[in-house]
């Protein structure tokens, strides 16, 4: 059986920050797929290139000139072959011609078109019968590159462990609201805003943020009788300068940063710890994982950039016990699925994640189920974040009915 690609259209659309990104439409007999790609602010050095160095228009021009003709007629059932083809047509090794965002939109749209033709959900087409619901984890206090005048640490996260996905997502929202109330009461003379991911942004220290977070979590957990995990995304690359980790009010050496990450779990009970070290320090990650990996999830994002080769190195060194998955870090569904499978085969958990510049596309909701992710990281509020959470509620309904 073959399902030849009949037509492909690409266009510019706006993301949640009001920046241009790309959207791709793929048409096959009896099927149609559309995907808009997100964009990150905190990006890893080894990610594929989002767009041509000459800009998004140049990436679209490259597609029209060098890619379109070759993919028309290609069998959409051959996802691996399609992804290999657009990788070869790009020719750069890092999608610096076509752009990783456009390759992501094309790759995901092919999968969506086939799932539509077959009349099955995307999560089932990608994951088969091996799928499970993730828990939502979302940013409630933000800083770093996601917010001006915020905390040094980029994300303070919560993950409610409710009986259902819906309950968990809503309890996360309640924590977000509670934090807003606490900040308004305690910080009457300080401006309070929201960052790219709709987390609260306020000019306070990381230690003050911990106090607010823990107060909100304890109060909401007591009110709802739901256990709530806390988490951090250090985004340590944005703190790293000349071998040191530079915070607003202190500077830490490599060893001090390792000790600090360990103390976060021991002193504050933080369960989820993402990117605590610079993205080349596999050994530093491993020291943290060795000390607290039995009590916490140590997650590699910028460390791995969804790259199977880097994940293999992390597995060999015992760097982390979890991997973050972002399709547009690696550029194709095939490579993202390989990354998730590689992690799982080595006993590592995976977390499918949004980007700070999101769209209302919900493909990552389906991938988090298809990849049997422990968590799906997609914020707590905001239309582009809620789109994923609502889709996961629909999927949960299908899986439990």
Curated annotation (Swiss-Prot):
InterPro entries: Enolase, Enolase-like_C_sf, Enolase-like_N, Enolase_C, Enolase_CS, Enolase_N. This is Enolase. Catalyzes the reversible conversion of 2-phosphoglycerate (2-PG) into phosphoenolpyruvate (PEP). It is essential for the degradation of carbohydrates via glycolysis. The lineage of its organism: Archaea, Methanobacteriati, Thermoplasmatota, Thermoplasmata, Thermoplasmatales. One of its GO terms (biological process) is glycolytic process. CDD domains: enolase. It comes from Thermoplasma volcanium (strain ATCC 51530 / DSM 4299 / JCM 9571 / NBRC 15438 / GSS1). Its main location: cytoplasm. It catalyses: (2R)-2-phosphoglycerate = phosphoenolpyruvate + H2O.
